[in-house]
Amino acid sequence: MIRFTRRTLIAVAAATVAATLSPLALAADTIKIGLVTALSGQSAQAGEALTRGMSIAIDEINAKGGLLGGRKLELVRRDDEGNPAKGVVAARELIFKEKVAVLFGGLDTPVSMAIVPIVNQEKVPFVGPWAAGTGVTRNGANPNFAFRVSAVDELVDKAMLNYAQKTFKSSKAGLILVNNPWGESNEKGITAALAEKGQKPVGVEKFEASDVDLVPQLSRLKAAGADTLYLVGNVGPSAQVVKSLDRMGWKVPVVSHWGPAGGRFTELAGPNAKNVHFVQTFSFFGKLSPVGEKVVAELKAKYPAIKGPDDITPAVGVANAYDGMQLAALAIAKAGSTQGDAIREGFYKIDRYDGLIKSYVKPFSPSVHDALQADDYVWAQFIDNRILPVGLTQ
């Protein structure tokens, strides 16, 4: 008969605990953060930028001991390919299988708009680091689980108009927009901004994301007397606008939403890509704050291909995702748990965060789910395949 001493029983218990803390168990104890974004196709570069911004923030948080008593954060990504249906499948997998505490996503407004009803129903906080459609955060849900650290169409549209009128003395606006919910959102916003000034567009033209010849639409805008084009579209079709203008020989100012920044714009558009001025929320060029210098150093250390600001592109993807992840971590800490309702309330309890883009002071409230405002935007253009603030040629 085997007799167990007290010491033996303690040893057995310790071994049992050790066995329980297998890699799988430890992984389950991490706090999973989901990301649904384009990781392939023309906008893959932007999806990678979001990944890098979030990863740097997560590394910082984990190095400080993690959250909620030492739990580390783990990033789990899924590729939506810019397709709303695939985005929904990816979001459901991350919510129901991976059990993410917070879901980030993504690049395209149609994808985000398809995901928002799911996160509101399942009470999973959703942070948008790119998609600018006004309805992503202003979705009418109560309670609303969608937050954003990015541009907002309604504000961008006013900024585009003000910039065009100040910079190019624009008085006859021609709208050239992608034919999807993002384009519709901006058509309403630009038209409303013009109406506030007693104006209206001289023409509104639409294009499909797959179009390669926009000469017919642009010719109609030229015939209508447009003296400035207001462009809303992602990388590929925005490049086709530039190439179509080249074929027409029409030299007209182009003021754009930030779609051109999302990928291989200069490669696809050619040398006149520099003629497009587009909105951004951040640039790594020029004098950086201490946070900016720290992030650049961390990016260089983690990604050897990054040698300087030229290689951090698109900058807005990195910056928005970095600040968004830090704010989400603060919300989890304020919540004291990974329960969705508590994290949502945690966002409202954030008092201050000195971030990469700016210092955020009470960035969220039940009526304000967008952390960035119009005065946080900057205007940029491509110079020698680099995204630089307009007027900066370093």
Positions of PLM-derived features:
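Extracytosolic ligand-binding ectodomains
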Residues: 2-12, 27-394
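N-terminal signal peptide c-region/cleavage motif recognized by signal peptidases
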Residues: 20-23
